């Protein structure tokens, strides 16, 4: 897969909407932070150090492809890309907002199905990420562990017998693992239970963030729930703990949905129908309004209020309607009004398909 194909399509494997509990869990993610033992952390690297890191990453990717993953991995140096294209990767959750800036010595390796991505020279030397559809933390971990093992065949990671893997941020020291689930929780928000739930999650050592992770706000009632520290626990324990909590959150959201629909059936049907009506007829729409209305429609699909729409379409729209993706499809820079017009046209077309 070439770079142009990568940034021209809004589809990724995690958007398929076929995983367990896809009505609530958009995706599961496993991220591993790794650093080479013979280089300083990224914040202290010299220019020769960064070139050595990029060359090491290229060698590591070659090793990954020798393992025989179903989807080939390609490495791209970000200095050779445009800001617009890098923003598309942010919108597709393949790189972080931080990785898209100051790119002279940075790279990213991405598999053809976009399930695997490896950020090079972000906060750590390597950030291995695996995304899976629905609640599939164990499957994402299986793939991430295989990628990690393949890299260790070629690279020597910084590791301490007592502390574990050494990372730039102390909260990642240990396993270097961050497990997360992206969840749609409209009923908990509408019944005003979300605040209490998030407080309880923080007491359990979890953190709740917005759609694009740290420093971002929740949009479309979509939240990212992840572990906060990785020291002193095995990878399997961290993942099992998050999965158990995710299942509890799913049960709580489902109960809230049943309560809402049982007590306020007419109001919910009106809210969902209005959202569907606007999205299928509007001639211009902002990203904020679209996110809010798509959240209502997604809830309506789960409750059977609106015609059955594939979750894949709803997931892909979350990305395809973002500013960078819209401009890439247009082949030119768009002003805000032009983006709103193209966004509305895109949503009308996809929902009526």
Curated annotation (Swiss-Prot):
EC number: 2.7.14.1
A GO cellular component annotation in the UniProt record: extracellular space
Activity control mechanisms: Appears to be allosterically activated by the binding of pArg-containing polypeptides to the pArg-binding pocket localized in the C-terminal domain of McsB.
Catalytic activity reported: L-arginyl-[protein] + ATP = N(omega)-phospho-L-arginyl-[protein] + ADP + H(+)
Chain positions of motif RDXXRA motif of the pArg binding pocket involved in allosteric regulation: 339-344
Protein function: Catalyzes the specific phosphorylation of arginine residues in proteins.
Similarity annotation: Belongs to the ATP:guanido phosphotransferase family.
UniProt protein name: Protein-arginine kinase
Organism the protein comes from: Symbiobacterium thermophilum (strain DSM 24528 / JCM 14929 / IAM 14863 / T)
């Amino acid at each position: 897969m070439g770079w142009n194909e990568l940034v021209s399509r809004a589809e990724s494997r995690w958007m398929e909407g076929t995983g367990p509990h896809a009505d609530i869990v958009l995706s599961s993610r496993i991220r591993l932070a790794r650093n080479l033992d013979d280089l300083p952390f990224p914040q202290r690297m010299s220019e020769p150090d960064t070139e050595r890191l990029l060359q090491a990453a290229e060698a590591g990717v070659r090793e990954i492809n020798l393992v025989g993953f179903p989807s080939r991995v390609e490495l791209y140096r970000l200095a050779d890309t445009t800001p617009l294209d890098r923003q598309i990767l942010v919108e597709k959750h393949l790189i972080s907002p931080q990785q898209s800036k100051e790119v002279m010595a940075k790279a990213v390796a991405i598999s053809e199905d976009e399930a695997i991505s490896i950020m090079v020279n972000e906060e750590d030397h390597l950030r291995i990420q695996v995304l899976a559809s629905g609640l599939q933390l164990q499957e994402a971990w299986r793939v991430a562990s295989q990628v990690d093992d393949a890299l260790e065949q070629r690279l020597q990671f910084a590791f301490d017998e007592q502390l574990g893997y050494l990372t730039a941020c102390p909260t990642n020291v240990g396993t270097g693992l961050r497990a997360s689930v992206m969840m749609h929780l409209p009923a908990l928000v509408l019944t005003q239970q979300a605040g209490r739930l998030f407080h309880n999650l923080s007491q359990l050592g979890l953190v709740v963030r917005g759609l694009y992770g740290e420093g971002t706000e929740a949009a479309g009632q979509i939240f990212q729930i992840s572990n906060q520290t990785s020291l002193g626990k095995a990878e399997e324990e961290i993942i099992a703990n998050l999965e158990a909590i995710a299942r509890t959150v799913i049960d709580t959201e489902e109960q809230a949905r049943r309560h809402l629909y049982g007590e306020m059936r007419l109001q919910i049907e009106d809210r969902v129908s209005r959202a569907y009506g606007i999205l299928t007829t509007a001639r211009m729409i902002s990203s904020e309004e679209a996110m809010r209305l798509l959240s209502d429609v997604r809830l309506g699909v789960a409750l059977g209020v609106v015609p059955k729409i594939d979750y894949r379409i709803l997931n892909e729209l979350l990305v395809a309607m973002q500013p960078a993706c819209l401009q890439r499809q247009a082949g030119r820079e768009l002003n805000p009004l032009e983006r709103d017009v193209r966004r509305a046209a895109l949503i009308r077309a996809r929902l009526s398909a």
